[in-house]
């Protein structure tokens, strides 16, 4: 991955300015989810998308199909502010401050433990009264989790939380469940059907936190990520329309192009186990795919930088999607 990719991504960030598909229904294999012209691609007699209401029907069906696999996004109507504490504070050059924070994403009750996420938050001591755009920065599959985008290890060209902060943004780099400081037992937390939905929930609480900060313009929020962080950006941005710009560095391809259609890599507890248990790792049965998800981000901005020799996320599937 070359540094210029994130330079372009930064330029993009500066702009911050279907009925459910059942397994017994007929489908055209990999073509169904790539067809964005129809209100319902399985039943084209319903007609093509002619207006915004038609597209909303299609987007609603995409979300329903996504939640069949990931589990439903819990109700967020009575959450209240995010409680957090500062664990460490480190001054950096040019008036930048790196704070290691911890915040509650799930309150405990008689049936489950409270869950807390640690993250690195970059803010500015100079012109501290200015409300700045903010970016949620999601890490790749790496043991140190949030430490890589924060510039504390890993690949130098993936220190995007630090780099974007140096360019004037407020940035937040949280741990994905089971990475970094976020020890997490997926099987012991049965309220989540997938690690993907748990991560989406945590990320949305991160957006809540950012919007409440006096240093942040709550109407200018973006999200960026590499690999795991790339598709995590897409998933989170699909559910959270407060994210106005989504930037991915690899992280997706058509399911039929992922290891020639072998979806085992998507099925661990960290991701979507139902792809294996309910859909036999068969991309022709999984009721959603990335062309729909990325289309569902419209009219918000989306940028991707995808390598042409990626073994995981095969580039022709990216081209099919875009």
What are the language-model segments listed below?
Residues 22-74:
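N-terminal pre-domain segments of enzymes
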Residues 245-293, 314-322:
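Mobile cap/lid helix-loop segments that gate and shape the active-site cleft of serine hydrolases
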Residues 128-215, 219, 239, 259-264:
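Cap/lid segment of the alpha/beta-hydrolase catalytic domain
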Residues 223-225, 249:
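Short beta-strand immediately N-terminal to the catalytic nucleophile in serine-hydrolase-like folds
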Residues 225-229, 233:
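Gly/Ala-rich beta-loop-alpha elbow adjacent to hydrolase catalytic centers
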Residues 298-300, 304-313:
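Conserved strand-to-loop "acid loop" that flanks and positions the catalytic carboxylate
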Residues 60, 68, 73-130:
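N-terminal cap/lid segment of alpha/beta-hydrolase-fold proteins
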